[in-house]
From Swiss-Prot:
Its EC number is 6.2.1.-. One of its GO terms (biological process) is fatty acid metabolic process. This is Putative long chain fatty acid-CoA ligase VraA. CDD domains: AFD_YhfT-like (cd17633). SUPFAM superfamilies: Acetyl-CoA synthetase-like. Keywords: Fatty acid metabolism, Ligase, Lipid metabolism. GO terms for molecular function: medium-chain fatty acid-CoA ligase activity. Pfam families: AMP-binding (PF00501), AMP-binding_C (PF13193). It is an enzyme of class 6 (ligase). Belongs to the ATP-dependent AMP-binding enzyme family. InterPro entries: AMP-bd_C (IPR025110), AMP-bd_C_sf (IPR045851), AMP-binding_CS (IPR020845), AMP-dep_synth/lig_dom (IPR000873), ANL_N_sf (IPR042099). The gene is vraA. The lineage of its organism: Bacteria, Bacillati, Bacillota, Bacilli, Bacillales.
Amino acid sequence: MDVILEQLETHTQNKPNDIALHIDDETITYSQLNARITSAVESLQKYSLNPVVAINMKSPVQSIICYLALHRLHKVPMMMEGKWQSTIHRQLIEKYGIKDVIGDTCLMQNIDSPMFIDSTQLQHYPNLLHIGFTSGTTGLPKAYYRDEDSWLASFEVNEMLMLKNENAIAAPGPLSHSLTLYALLFALSSGRTFIGQTTFHPERLLNQCRKISSYKVAMFLVPTMIKSLLLVYNNEHTIQSFFSSGDKLYSSIFKKIKNQANDINLIEFFGTSETSFISYNLNQQAPVESVGVLFPNVELKTTNHDHNGIGTICVKSNMMFSGYVSEQCINNDEWFVTNDNGYVKEQYLYLTGRQHDMLIIGGQNIYPAHVERLLTQSSSIDEAIIIGIPNERFGQIGVLLYSGDVTLTHKNVKQFLNKKVKRYEIPSMIHHVEKMYYTASGKIAREKMMSMYLRGEL
């Protein structure tokens, strides 16, 4: 992480009293951050650390300091999610052979597991930032390598979308989440203030943004966080832009943003932990069902097309990750095959859904995300997912689970979707839910919702 550390050192020298971190009620200047990193380096130097050191801490401030201190010691941080169940922690430590784990109270060393990631293996991945994990929504989280060059390339294109002289970046999610860690390093490398929270609390976050009068804030959030913020937002705050990632932002939320804060820029990113950014949509200028236009440094193709021309999305860019741990290294010249299906039309990317969410109804492939986006254009529906349940005649049938203040009939839904989708894409059943349940990364937990529905718990 040579470049980012050099940039951080430059900011420490040129503006030592500027705020680097504003976490909850604590503010830390660039000078103070440098001193605390130096102190952490001195403490960690007492130990014989292995090449990879896991960080599993609840405190964002301590996590940031440890992350940067490990880089000064030429170690590779592995970012673990503190909210994972202890069994998941144990499984990951055993699977990847992690010997050193920094927790909230101590450094645990010589964990009884065979060394898996060693210095020889890391030589194939120069200039690593960290080892991160996928969200693990369909199984055990999967470890991957992220290098510095890829995020420096992301910072460059991201800067093009900072259109309002934003001098602070807020990201209230856990640092183990790629979006939050990205926002932190983007802020520190560019000399801005990073605003974060131990636990997301919308009203307190807005108060943090208001506390320093000079803040012009860009917020990096998932859609569910934006929805929560709008419930307590007023025009006193200094938010200049929302950068939304992790899921498609419902058009109803965009309308609320423009009704409550017409001057705020809304930039939707589509990408993954592995690919970083793929496309963007500024102020919903793209067609409603699209996830925007490709970033200029992204190449995209689709393969394995069905009869509708929908295929598997493959991406190539200099923002790509370096590969999964224990698998082959990936370079910028290789195509990465995502788990997403979609198509490109007139320069806009359309995402039809994740491969494992696809339903097969009467022999027809159904992509729920496409229908869900249409449904959320209805003023009667806040959020919607379509799940598949077994059916003797058709193999599966689609069931719409939706939230909103209005109770709909199947006839209402059918009339709304008529002429918008094919007949077999219309859900066979509908069910109103009081609320949706979400994953740790803020996405609707499809598997949990389906399990609860099948058990009669919704």
